[in-house]
């Protein structure tokens, strides 16, 4: 492998690792309820779409939405990110990051699973989320389970 090929490979590996770290930090800051740190992971015009409401656009709106989540006593979210697939395209990239989600709602243990459809952009201070779209496959009470007719025994 000649030097230019090696340099390109190292750049690709470094970019992919930086993007994986972006997704890990997102989960970490959700766990730690760190609103400002969460918002900083997004580009200035970044967007979050949970499919539960209209997409949230721009850092001020993201800050407000994340703060509401932190202030909600029922919003005990614990995401685990894994199986991250990334496609690079210069200073842009796209990816899918799968999540398992634990939470408590109305005093009940909840379990969720799904994935994020992400678009990333490289800025002067590193990789940022341009957009993050959450697709939940299920989010159910642990006791009920997610397969029809397979609720846990009392």
Where are these regions (language model features)?
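A solvent-exposed, acidic/Ser-Thr-rich amphipathic alpha-helical stretch
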Residues: 35-101
């Amino acid at each position: 492998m000649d030097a230019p090929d090696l340099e390109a490979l190292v750049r690709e590996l470094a970019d992919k690792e930086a993007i994986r770290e972006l997704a890990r930090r997102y989960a970490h800051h959700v766990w730690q309820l760190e609103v400002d740190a969460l918002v900083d992971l997004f580009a200035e015009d970044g967007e979050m779409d949970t499919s539960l409401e209209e997409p949230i656009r721009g850092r001020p709106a993201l800050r407000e939405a994340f703060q509401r989540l932190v202030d909600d006593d029922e919003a005990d979210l614990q995401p685990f990110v894994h199986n991250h697939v990334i496609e690079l395209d210069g200073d842009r990239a796209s990816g899918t990051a799968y999540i398992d989600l634990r939470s408590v709602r109305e005093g009940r243990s909840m379990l969720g699973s799904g994935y994020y459809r992400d678009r990333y952009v490289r800025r002067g201070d590193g990789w940022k989320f341009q957009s993050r779209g959450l697709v939940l496959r299920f989010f159910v009470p642990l006791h009920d389970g997610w397969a029809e007719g397979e609720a846990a025994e009392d």
